[in-house]
Structures are given as C-alpha cells and as structure tokens.
C-alpha cells in the first residue's frame, strides 16, 4: 500500500508540472540528527481531491525550477496542524505559481512532532526548516540562486514553522552541527499562520502536537513568535481572513504589530471572509493575495 501511495504521489506531482524541472532531495546527506529508530511509517492519503502526508520519517526538499530563474527562492512549509502536511494546495501549487514569476520554489516535507521518531519533538520541525535554508544557501551558486534572497513561507501550522525560522535563527535546533552557514531567511511569507500559543488565540491542535498537553510557561513563550520578533527579524508578508474559525486572525495581527514595534518591514492583507485553508484562492473575493505578494516581492528586491 505504501509503495502504491508513493507512485500516486509521484504521478500527482508530475501532472502538476508545466515548464518546471522538479527534483526531490533528501534534506540530510547522512543520518538525521536527533532521530530515533522507530516502527512508525509515513502515510500518504488522497482525500477530497487533495494529498496529505503524515508521519514523515525522512524529510525531503523538492526543488521546482522555473524555465528562467531570477535568483530568488522560497522554501514552502505546508500546513496541517503539525499533524499532517497539505502538500498539494499549500506546497506544489505554490511552487508552480512562483515558477511563473521566475522564482525557484522548494517544497519542504518536514518531520511532524512525534516523540517516537525524534529526541526533542519541539525542535524537530525547526531543525528541518533550518537545514532547508542552510542547504539552499550552500547550493546557491550551483543552482543559480542569490544567497541573499532566500525566503521561507508557511501556511497555518507551516506558518508557525516559517515564523519560528524567522525569529529563532540564532537558536540552532541541531546543536550538534558545526556548520556556520546562516539559517536566517531573508524574508518570511505567512499565510493564515499559527503564530501564538497564548491560550486566548492559539490553535490548540498545533500547540498540543508541538509541545504536548502540558507545556511549560517557558516553552509557550519561546514558541509564541510574536514575542520573539526583534529588529533583526526578516521582512514579513502576512495574509489572513477575519472569519478564520480555526486560527484566529489575531495571530497575524500580533505578529504584524511586533514587526512594526521592532521596525521590521511588514505588509499585511486581511480579508473579511475566506475562513481557513484557502490556499491560493480565497473564493470570497476577486482580489488575489498572490498578486499582492508579487508586488511586495518586487518591492523588496
């Protein structure tokens, strides 16, 4: 069943390709730091026309190369409450859209927090995000990319991971590495993101999956990323819907306010409706947030 699912996933990705060249690569060249040997198996589920991946054991980075690259790249973290990955409409579809702009897209299949497969599940996803940034920066010359134009993007819980990478780059999740390559992203794109673990606005599923049922006050503060923004945080672009019943819009608002307070360049687009998980297309409006993002990316170059 697993091999059949893998074949179906590869077919799905191949059918999504236009002029792009797609390459899936292991995130780590050898052993995965902090990993445990486990009987857990990766699951690929096709549901309601979408693709979901859970129980990720071996993280990968899939590079979508445009026909003519402009040097900018974005690492994309799909959402799914830190319990699964919406790899299609919050991953592959986004990389395809970036390719139309000449931007190289990287879809990150990151490990989801699980005590069975990692020594510290609170830092496992961040370790993968930091390794992805490190990898792209190290290979930038070979791939024709600008090492100073590497962004990170995330949806929902993937937005929490992206905002963690944007605020915790001085905290190496893999404390065994001797690599000094910078893991600071050059910009962050946060789409209906989980930002805060303040109980009043937290997405409880993401909070529990990442930190367990009884996190300490220090853990909650550490991973409430509106509290971790500094003047050195990268520019941020945020999108959210006011009627989001899953991740309250206050998550984006607090991050935006933290950016303004710390004089970090930020732009936020709030739509009155759209709910949660709309991906590229908020059907309640004719305005396309990806067009707004395109303008912003052109402005920060």
Language-model-detected regions and their locations in the chain:
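Bacterial Sec-dependent N-terminal signal peptides
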Residues: 1-23, 301
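N-terminal cap/lid segment of alpha/beta-hydrolase-fold proteins
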Residues: 21-68
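Mobile cap/lid helix-loop segments that gate and shape the active-site cleft of serine hydrolases
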Residues: 42, 46-48, 193-228, 234
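Short beta-strand element of the alpha/beta-hydrolase
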Residues: 71-79
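Catalytic nucleophile-loop/oxyanion-hole region of alpha/beta-hydrolase
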Residues: 86-87, 91-94, 110-147, 281-288
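Primarily recognizes the serine-hydrolase "nucleophile elbow" in alpha/beta-hydrolase
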Residues: 131-202, 220
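Short beta-strand/loop motif that positions the catalytic acidic residue
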Residues: 238-240, 244
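C-terminal catalytic histidine-bearing segment of alpha/beta-hydrolase fold enzymes
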Residues: 249, 253-301
């Amino acid at each position: 069943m697993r091999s059949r699912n893998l074949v179906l996933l590869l077919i799905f990705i191949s059918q999504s390709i236009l002029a792009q060249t797609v390459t899936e690569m292991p995130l780590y060249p050898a052993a995965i730091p902090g990993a445990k040997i486990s009987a857990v198996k990766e699951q690929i589920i096709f549901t309601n026309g979408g693709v979901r991946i859970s129980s990720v054991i071996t993280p990968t980075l899939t590079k979508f190369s445009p026909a003519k690259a402009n040097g900018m790249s974005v690492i994309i973290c799909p959402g799914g409450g830190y319990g699964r990955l919406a790899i299609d409409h919050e991953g592959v579809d986004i990389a395809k859209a970036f390719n139309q702009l000449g931007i190289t897209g990287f879809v990150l299949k990151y490990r989801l927090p699980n005590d069975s497969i990692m020594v510290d599940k609170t830092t496992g996803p961040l370790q993968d995000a930091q390794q992805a940034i490190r990898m792209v920066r190290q290979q930038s010359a070979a791939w024709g990319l600008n090492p100073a134009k590497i962004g990170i993007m995330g949806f929902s819980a993937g937005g929490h991971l992206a905002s963690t990478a944007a605020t915790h780059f001085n905290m190496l999740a893999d404390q065994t590495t001797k690599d000094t390559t910078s893991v600071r992203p050059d910009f962050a794109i946060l789409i209906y993101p989980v930002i805060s673990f303040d109980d009043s606005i937290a997405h409880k599923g993401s909070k529990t999956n990442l930190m367990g049922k009884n996190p300490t006050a220090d853990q909650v503060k550490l991973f409430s990323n509106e509290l971790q923004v500094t003047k050195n945080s990268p520019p941020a672009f945020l999108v959210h819907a006011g009627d989001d019943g899953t991740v309250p819009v206050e998550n984006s608002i607090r991050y935006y306010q933290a950016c303004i307070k710390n004089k970090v360049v930020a732009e936020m687009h709030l739509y009155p409706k759209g709910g949660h998980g709309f991906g590229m297309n908020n059907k309640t409006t004719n305005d396309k947030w990806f067009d707004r993002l395109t303008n912003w990316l052109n402005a920060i170059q």
